């Protein structure tokens, strides 16, 4: 054995002697051990006590139907990060090691184990307005490009405030159209948007009630766009208003819905942040891919003064959707948007900045 391997072995032995291993499981699978002694169900956080030097368990990630295990997450003080095989944690054979014993006796020692699961493709229903539709329509391309084989979708559109969940429910023709899709009982993912003319939760509740009655395993998403007429508000104020609404309206609303629908996945896509970041870069002279804030010629962030998305905003926002819905690692995503600006890096930064409590809990 080389010195390098010996040092690594000693370090691993010490780390494995922690008093507690916290196993965090997404809602898309479970973690068990080969011995059957430990069973951590979907959505649970399980604390495993390691109290002696004879602990020997092999942890196995079990994906739920429609998901695949893509490896153990790489986290601070995490075990087996980056590996895709069962994770064996073993303290056996170190009797008499004083350093090891001291770690075992230290109640502050805690280490982590967390699997990553990825959907093989959701059967999805997307409904919303014109600030929402282009991103929904981009998903089949991006899902296929990312190697997600079973993505299917239906998109229902209504312009302006008519695309808000409550307005779509109150529109008999649209409601019947959407209910017909839900009635099949096989919608895995139901994505809705937001419009300030309907700030309350009534529409979301009505759709959740109906969808869950057809399929109790449906997951729900609130996709938050940017504000309209961006040119009428200074950039700093425009950004501040969006972030304030995101944190004080959308996230609290999701928390309320989670309390009313326990056990149901409800989360947020902050794709409106894409418009904010592009505008900030444009104002700073750091966005040479466009010439105007708003223009109908395809060389702007917005295609008109009302604020509809031009190509670069659609491409950036679609990357945010892709990571939010499917957990795709954008650093390795094999697609070149074709801009000088690194849109994949910006999209990853947007998702990194998003409050993780409101990300998809199944990743």
Residue ranges of each PLM-predicted region?
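Conserved catalytic region of serine esterases and O-acyltransferases that act on ester linkages
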Residues: 292-363
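N-terminal module-boundary/linker segments of secreted carbohydrate-active enzymes
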Residues: 119-145, 335-338, 347-363
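Alpha-helical cap/lid subdomain in secreted, periplasmic
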Residues: 179-311, 323, 332
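Conserved SGNH/GDSL esterase-like catalytic core that processes O-acyl groups on lipids
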Residues: 124-127, 131-210
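Surface-exposed interfaces of beta-sheet-rich extracellular modules
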Residues: 54-95
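Extracellular/surface recognition and adhesion modules
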Residues: 23, 31-33, 59, 69-72, ...
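Extracellular modular ligand-binding repeats in secreted and cell-surface proteins
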Residues: 36-66, 107
